[in-house]
Structures are given as C-alpha cells and as structure tokens.
Design a protein with these regions (language model features):
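Acidic, Ala/Val/Gly-enriched low-complexity intrinsically disordered segments
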Residues: 4, 10, 16-17, 42, ...
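Intrinsic-disorder-associated, low-complexity terminal segments enriched in Asp/Asn/His/Tyr and depleted
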Residues: 21, 32-42
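Short beta->alpha junction loops
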Residues: 122-130
Length: 459
C-alpha cells in the first residue's frame, strides 16, 4: 500500500474523466485560531461551540492560492482548514516522481503558509478522501462545506454527490458562462476569433479599439529556427535547494514512481513560482517570440516560460502573468512579437482549451474517430527501446525532468502516435502520469483533439 503522504484519491470507474485529477485533490477547511478547550467556563464553551459550527472550505490540489474562489474571502476567524492526503489513487498505477513530488510538496508547503497566516490546519493522512471527510465532520461538525468550482469534470461530480456548495472560480480568465457569450449563434469556432474577443474583453495589448501595433498576431515573426551559435543565449533558471519537506515527500513516494529524482528545477511554493515568473519576464521573454516554435536536442527549455506547472496548480494566476508580460512590453523591455506570442498562449489557447473541455465533456474524453487501437509502445516508458533519435531525445527528457515543451509534445510525440495509430486514451493516460504540468482539462483536448484528431475535427 502506498504511504499516506501522497494525495492520491480513489478513482471513479468507467471513464478517463472520472478517474483523473483526483490524485491532486486537497481539502482545506480554513479554521478559527481559537484552541479547542475543555474548560467549564460559559464563555469558553460558547467560543468552542461557535468554532465547531464554522463552515468548511474544500480546496483542490490544483487550486493552491489564497486568491482563488472560496479562499479569497476566508479568514482565520471565519473558516476551518482540512488538508487530506489519500493513498487510494497512487496505488493503482505509477506516476513520474517529479510530478508526485511537485503536487505533494506544493500542498504541504501551502498548508504551512496557511498556518503561518494564522489558520489552524486539520492535516489528515488517511486511506481515502471519503475517510478524511468523515473524520473531519465527526470532529468539527462544520455548518456547511463549500468549494471553489473544481477544475475537472469528475471532481465536480464528486462535489455534487457529496452535497458541496460551489462558488465561481476566478482561476481562469474566461468562465464557461462567459464563453457561452462568445459562442452565441456561431456555427463554427476558431481559436483566433476567441483570442481576439479575449483581447478586447480583457483590454490586453489594445490601443483603444485597435490591437497594439495594428496587428492581432505576429506568428510570421515567431517561427525562426534556433541560432547555430551562442548556446548561452538561452537563460538558465537557478535550481532550488530541496528542503526537509521535499526530502520527506520523496522518501514517501519514491518506490511507487518512475523517472529521475528532482534536482530543484521546479519551485513548490508561491514565493518560488513568483521568482520563476520574474526570471522569465526579465531574462527569457525578450527572446521568446522568434524562437517559440524551435527545437534543439542540446537545450531542453530554450526560451519557454516553464510556468505551466504553477499556472495549473494555482501557485500562479493567469491574470498576474499576463499583466507582467504586458507591463514589460509597455516599459520597452520586450518586443511586441514576444509579448503578443506569449500572451496569446495564456489568454488565447489556454483559455480556449479550458472552455472546449467544459463544452464537450464527458463524452469527449472517450472519442476515437480514427479507431486507433495500437497499444502504447514500450519506448514511452523505457526510451532505450527505440533507435529513433527524435523520440528518444524527447522521451529521455520527460524521464529526466517530467517535462517537454509544447512543440516536442505535439510535433514529435503526437505525430508519432498519430501515424502509428496509438490508442488516444492510452496516450492521454501516459501524459497524465508523466508530465509535471498535467491536468485533465488540458491533456484531454490537446491529445484527443489537437494531437490525435480523435474528435474528428471538433477542435
């Protein structure tokens, strides 16, 4: 049995949608800082009774930010915190150790941040999420359980089944209800149309009613090959030193995972994520644009932001990332093609994929329009099994750091799987297990639609 240090939750049966995203779920109940007391004093007893009836805020492990949804208005005096780590999910399959470490360590450190801010945290390590909820309710008897809208279809089903009240999420820049306004009576949808609508609606890179620079898109300037010289052109982010929490998490998950151990490439705190954002804006974004579609065997990151893990687990919010990029352009620190190309990835493609997921789930996850039924080749889990240099290079990188940039995912891994007829659900599952920034809402549309054409052209 997997140690209870991992937050992997029992999977639902029957669909990709109902068996993913739960492992990264956490539950928080922000709590009153008044210590539980057994005093016979009437005043103490009243305080204890009031504390016991406080509402619970349920926060998922991909919502690790005080500014998201239900947490945004919570204080130590108004809510209680429950943090659950469950062993049920991880025991069913293997995950990349850097992915497991990133999720677990980020959650533990977020819990520490809440404690430091004055919140009392009921941190439970149990076999299942249901057990954790039952134990928490038995001890604290919350007046209600409320959650920010979960980020996966299965998690929303779970919240509904448990009678949890949900509040609207601000973790994305276009809520599905707003997306319906974009769809309107459109007979067809294109990401570019959505992107322009977003630019206007959010007033990003706009001069009045016109796009800054009189162009919406600078793609023709952003497809240059990498330079043949000057490998130091690509800024290298500093490594973080692993702390005691990191070591404890690694000791707990190592025997149940695959891949190379982390070396400090990925931050696991809000502070670290903000440092990564600052590094990207100051050092990397100025050279991002023209080479954003390039690949190099000798350099795994080039000018990519490496911010997707933090955006996808909540340590960073898209609005602050977009504002930082736009400000850098307005201050003359980065060229327009770099700012526009990066911002398009955030408010365009990312938000578009997010809303397509909610528009088409749950059936979308099972689509296989081409009838692809080839099993995932062994090289995906053991790169030494292939003599194809391009595949081995990318797969070695995934094994080493739980990451490859989007061009490698689409143009190398995705193209191979499409040509070989690999089952799209197996490919989705492998990516979900392997990538540090994996989320069902992004993996399903990108694999089923963008990469494998398993949706028959819907995306």
């Amino acid at each position: 049995m997997f140690p209870v240090f991992c937050p992997f939750l029992a999977p639902f049966k029957g669909s990709v949608a109902r068996s993913t995203n739960f492992w990264c779920m956490t539950i928080f109940c922000l709590c009153n800082t008044t210590h539980r007391s057994h005093s016979n004093s009437d005043s103490t007893g009243l305080l204890y009774a009031e504390a016991m009836s406080l509402p619970t805020i349920w926060v998922f492990g991909d919502q690790l930010n005080r500014g998201i949804g239900a947490l945004a208005t919570a204080t130590p005096l108004t809510h209680r915190v429950l943090f659950i780590e469950s062993a049920a999910k991880i025991s069913s399959q293997k995950w990349h150790i850097q992915r497991a470490h990133f999720i677990v360590a980020s959650m533990r450190k977020f819990a520490h941040e809440l404690r430091s801010a004055g919140f009392q945290v009921d941190y439970r390590m149990v076999k299942s999420m249901g057990q954790g909820i039952k134990e928490h309710v038995r001890e604290f008897a919350p007046s209600e359980i409320v959650a920010t809208e979960p980020n996966s279809y299965a998690s929303r089903l779970l919240a509904h089944d448990l009678g949890v009240r949900t509040v609207s999420s601000n973790q994305f820049l276009c809520h599905p209800s707003e997306y319906q306004g974009f769809l309107g009576a459109r007979k067809s949808i294109k990401m570019e149309d959505f992107y322009r609508w977003q630019r206007k609606r959010l007033n990003v890179l706009m001069d009045g009613s016109e796009p800054t620079g009189d162009r919406w898109n600078f793609d023709d300037e952003n497809r240059q090959p990498p330079p043949k010289t000057g490998h130091d052109r690509w800024p290298v982010p500093a490594l973080y030193e692993l702390d005691e929490v990191d070591e404890q998490v690694l000791a707990a998950v190592q025997s149940h995972c695959f891949g190379k151990l982390p070396v400090g490439q990925w931050a696991t705190t809000r502070e670290g994520a903000l440092e990564r954002l600052q590094f990207f804006i100051e050092r990397v974004l100025p050279v991002f644009g023209e080479h954003e579609d390039a690949m190099l065997k000798s350099n795994w990151h080039l000018a990519h932001s490496l911010l997707s893990p933090y955006l996808n687990n909540g340590l960073l919010l898209p609005r602050e990332v977009v504002e930082a990029a736009q400000s850098a352009f307005r201050e003359g620190k980065v060229p327009l093609n770099s700012a526009e190309g990066f911002i398009r990835q955030i408010i365009g493609w990312r938000e578009y994929i997010w809303n397509c997921y909610w528009q088409w789930m749950p059936d979308y996850a099972h689509m296989n329009a081409l009838g692809a039924d080839v099993k995932l080749p062994p090289m995906f889990t053991n790169p030494s099994k292939t003599s194809m240099a391009c595949m081995k290079s990318v797969l070695d990188g995934v094994n080493e750091r739980s990451y490859s940039h989007h061009i490698e995912r689409l143009m190398v891994l995705g193209n191979f799987a499409l040509i070989a007829g690999v089952n799209p659900q197996q490919l989705t599952r492998w990516m979900w297990n392997s990538y540090i920034d994996a989320a069902e809402w992004v993996m399903v549309p990108n694999v089923i639609g963008m990469s494998q054409y398993a949706d028959g052209g819907m995306l």
